[in-house]
């Protein structure tokens, strides 16, 4: 995402131009891996890594070297692999559709995450629609994150709004 911000001023969730360029870049990387595999008789693959440690380390290094670049080095971490940035407001279905083409290009591994803001048990139909959309769009490995709480007194695990549904503690 930040590479696209540097090159065209927007990431792949923000414009068609950035979306196309992002796919061109990763397609070129995949073609290079395939060519080297054929040339050397070895297995090379393209991995879309969720390298959490590197994303923070690299942005600090780049900020020291290049200064603060809006939309690039002004955050604490870089966006992993081909993901739409977590701060960008986008529907789960659009995010899936934008990230899915990268799964076919990254034969060494990939994952797409969907972040829910509530308890999926309260809307299982929507949860199922997200999973089906992932399948239909070609998401090879998908994950759905949602909030979960744990009451330290009774040990209840689940969504706790204002009151624990098990022991009714309100602290």
What does each model-found stretch correspond to?
Residues 1-170:
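Long, C-terminal-biased catalytic regions of enzyme "large/alpha" subunits
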């Amino acid at each position: 995402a930040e590479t696209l911000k540097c090159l065209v001023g927007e990431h792949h969730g923000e414009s068609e131009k950035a979306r196309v360029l992002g796919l061109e870049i990763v397609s070129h990387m995949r073609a290079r891996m395939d060519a080297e595999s054929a040339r050397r008789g070895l297995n090379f693959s393209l991995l879309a890594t969720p390298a959490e440690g590197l994303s923070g380390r690299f942005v600090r290094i780049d900020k020291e070297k290049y200064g603060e670049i809006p939309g690039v080095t002004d955050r604490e971490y870089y966006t992993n692999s081909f993901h739409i940035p977590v701060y960008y407001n986008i529907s789960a279905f659009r995010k899936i559709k934008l990230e899915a083409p990268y799964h076919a290009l990254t034969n060494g591994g990939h994952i797409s995450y969907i972040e829910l803001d509530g308890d999926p048990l309260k809307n299982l139909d929507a949860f199922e629609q997200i999973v089906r959309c992932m399948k239909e769009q070609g998401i090879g490995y998908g994950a759905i994150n949602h909030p979960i709480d744990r009451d330290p007194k009774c040990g209840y695990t689940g969504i706790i709004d204002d009151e624990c549904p098990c022991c009714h503690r309100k602290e």
